[in-house]
Amino acid sequence: MQTVRMTTAQALVKFLNQQYVEFDGKQQKFVKGIFTIFGHGNVVGLGQALEEDAGELEVYQGRNEQGMANAAMAFAKQKHRKQIMACTSSVGPGSANMITSAATASANNIPVLLLPGDVFATRQPDPVLQQIEQTHDLSISTNDAFRAVSKYWDRINRPEQLMTAMIQAMRVLTNPADTGAVTICLPQDVQGEAWDFPSYFFQKRVHRIERRLPTKASLADAVEMIKRKKKPVMICGGGVRYAEAAEELKQFAETFHIPFGETQAGKSAIESSHPYNLGGIGVTGNVAANTIAKEADLVIGIGTRFTDFTTASKQLFQNEEVEFLNINISEFHANKLDALKVIADAKEALLALIDELQEIDYQSSYTVEIADAKDAWETELSRLHNIRFTCQDFTPEVEGHFNENLNEYVDALGTQLTQTAVIGQINTLLDKDAIIVGAAGSLPGDLQRMWASRKPNTYHMEYGYSCMGYEVAGALGAKLAEPSKEVYAMVGDGSYQMLHSELVTSLQENKKINVLLFDNSGFGCINNLQMGNGMGSFGTEFRYRNQETRKLDGAIMKIDFAASAAGYGVKTYHVTSLEQLQEALIDAKKQTVSTLIDIKVLPKTMTNGYESWWHVGVAEVSKNQSVQAAYESKVSNLQQARSY
């Protein structure tokens, strides 16, 4: 047997260079590159291996471990899970910073390979710098926290363990049914230890992502169910995008006259203008999709996880005859809502159903309902685009909260811009193939409802975990995946302040991204939630501490985000009017460096809910009568929802 004497880290790098995926006959490198933040826990081990021979891996320098791991996840998401980035950090706080990203990737079923440094396997120098000592179990380190949020976790305590660990890592990373974060913990001493690795460990490995076919039995059951139903609705989930099944879904909708709503992950699989595309569905959905869904007698989920935002906490579907048909590559997700399961690739399942349903000349019973619902939404959308603030008698979209306070915000922020009008203009002015990236706050709701996707795969929303601070890093990842397209991070001031470090990495890599920062001086989405459930405004506006009351009810904070970003070398713009916004967007397209447009918008001018409910933990007992009323409303809505 031929062997090669290498360190564990050197063997890992060599192995990663030999991984390929094949999908529909097309073969490509699986691991594009690796994000690094070096510290004592990885620099002389994995860092040395990368310096000596990185092979074809592109080595990137991150600024924050969570930021770079978010960028790696976004890269894989934009690549439809067919190519990934790895991430390496030092031990302790560096690795802990990636835990949130691991959870984000696993929640979204997006592959990302995390390689955190770890404490010494020999324990000779214990406690090493940045080590936690657990007196009840000395084998525990910070990296054990990854177990809860990883789809596969391993620790390499001996060099020879690397082989089985990495084989299993690749199994999970290339498994469309159960992929997510894979964490391989690398004790810093073991990284540098040498071993005689067999040459066959480094052979070229092609991981074929196969399309699972539906069984004849499940297909027959699905046909029997569909043919009994008159008004079915489909839900286009992220699985439609990852399976590249958009054309088949369109064919299915057109052939059988069945409309579909979009989840956040599924949006832009098919352009918004398609006659059967109702748009966003659920809590952050629009009136068209939710109205049709409420009356549907069959819900066909295609590649969706049926989160509470998609099902409106299982209260959206009100037809007493409603049943569920779930097409999913994952048995776990297909099993939800007592559905009839078709465990299969979305494309293959749709093609098989088309053939079977054409045999019986199936057609839904919709007449004008689909067109009427879309027309009603277009009318509402036009209204949202044209909302303008007036100092007197202005009623915001989220009314009854700040009606008397809005003029204070007008003065403090120097703006009269409404959020819906800003989104409308942005949607009009961006290139058709531009990619928008979002994750948290009020913007995901506005974008799922309002954004018209004009080209496929241009809507990139991380809403499986809704990770605050994902947006800027996500934009960098999307840009690395599609460097020829303009990429825009759609981010609120709250999420931006949590994390935007990879904006600097975009400058370093000359990968231009555009940050559209909506500043309403607060956590506006959560302010809506608390006040909508009977509370006052508490800890969600960005106000100075009042020296008299000792509470955060002083003057509104105004932050010059443009000035801050300009210090990095970003091209920046201040916007307080639609005219300035248009000028900034046009000029930003001409730039070759990353840009940031600081857009001051008024609170409460985002969209509100349409025909949906969200189950949150309202206080059962309170001295506040408004909270008591909110609890009673929750109980009433819960009675109309499925129990599971």
Curated annotation (Swiss-Prot):
EC number: 3.7.1.22
Pathway: Polyol metabolism; myo-inositol degradation into acetyl-CoA; acetyl-CoA from myo-inositol: step 3/7
Positions contributing to Mg(2+) binding: 493, 520
GO cellular component, one term: acetolactate synthase complex
Names of the cofactor(s): Mg(2+); thiamine diphosphate
Residue ranges, annotated region (Thiamine pyrophosphate binding): 442-522
Molecular function terms, GO-annotated: 3D-(3,5/4)-trihydroxycyclohexane-1,2-dione hydrolase activity; acetolactate synthase activity; flavin adenine dinucleotide binding; magnesium ion binding; thiamine pyrophosphate binding
InterPro entries referenced in this protein's UniProt entry, alphabetically: DHS-like_NAD/FAD-binding_dom (IPR029035), Myo_inos_IolD (IPR030817), THcHDO_hydrolase_firmi (IPR023757), THDP-binding (IPR029061), Thiamin_PyroP_enz_cen_dom (IPR012000), Thiamin_PyroP_enz_TPP-bd_dom (IPR012001), TPP-bd_CS (IPR000399), TPP_enz (IPR045229)
Top-level taxon in the UniProt lineage: Bacteria
Record keywords, A-Z: Hydrolase, Magnesium, Metal-binding, NAD, Thiamine pyrophosphate
Matches recorded under PROSITE patterns: TPP_ENZYMES (PS00187)
Cofactor note: Binds 1 Mg(2+) ion per subunit. Binds 1 thiamine pyrophosphate per subunit.
GO terms under biological process: inositol catabolic process; isoleucine biosynthetic process; L-valine biosynthetic process
Catalysis: reaction(s): 3D-3,5/4-trihydroxycyclohexane-1,2-dione + H2O = 5-deoxy-D-glucuronate + H(+)
Pfam families: TPP_enzyme_C (PF02775), TPP_enzyme_M (PF00205), TPP_enzyme_N (PF02776)
UniProt xrefs under CDD domains: TPP_IolD, TPP_PYR_POX_like
Top EC class of this enzyme: hydrolase
Residues reported in the UniProt entry to bind thiamine diphosphate: 65
Family: Belongs to the TPP enzyme family.
HAMAP family named among the record's database cross-references: IolD
Described function: Involved in the cleavage of the C1-C2 bond of 3D-(3,5/4)-trihydroxycyclohexane-1,2-dione (THcHDO) to yield 5-deoxy-glucuronate (5DG).
The name this protein goes by in its record: 3D-(3,5/4)-trihydroxycyclohexane-1,2-dione hydrolase
Organism: Bacillus anthracis
